[in-house]
Amino acid sequence: TDILAANPKLDAFGIMGGWPLFGAPQPYRDLFGPLKDRIASNDFVVGAADTIGDEVAIARDGLVTALVGQRPFEMGYKAPSVMIDLVEGKAVADPVFTGLDECTKDTVDTCIQK
């Protein structure tokens, strides 16, 4: 609230971690709810990291412009085989890319991959 009040011309907000959305979803809704029309028109853009829990519901409600999330299932699935390959002296990709999920209000029902 202080940042928004001190910067009335602010037109974008980047959240570099999902905790404000999934750790405190109601305060987030209270803060950005009054900006919903500006967010919908892209007059005010909110980008946030992660695509878990309440974040997806918040995107569905139009209170965030875009979410970019890691794929923890893929990380857990690939990690053992990569570790075994390393132990066996085999080459592994560097980095090992597990993909990202990119969600907007329009894609929220289909954007999350396993």
Residues of each region from the PLM?
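A residue-level marker of the well-folded mature domains of exported/periplasmic proteins
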Residues: T1-K114
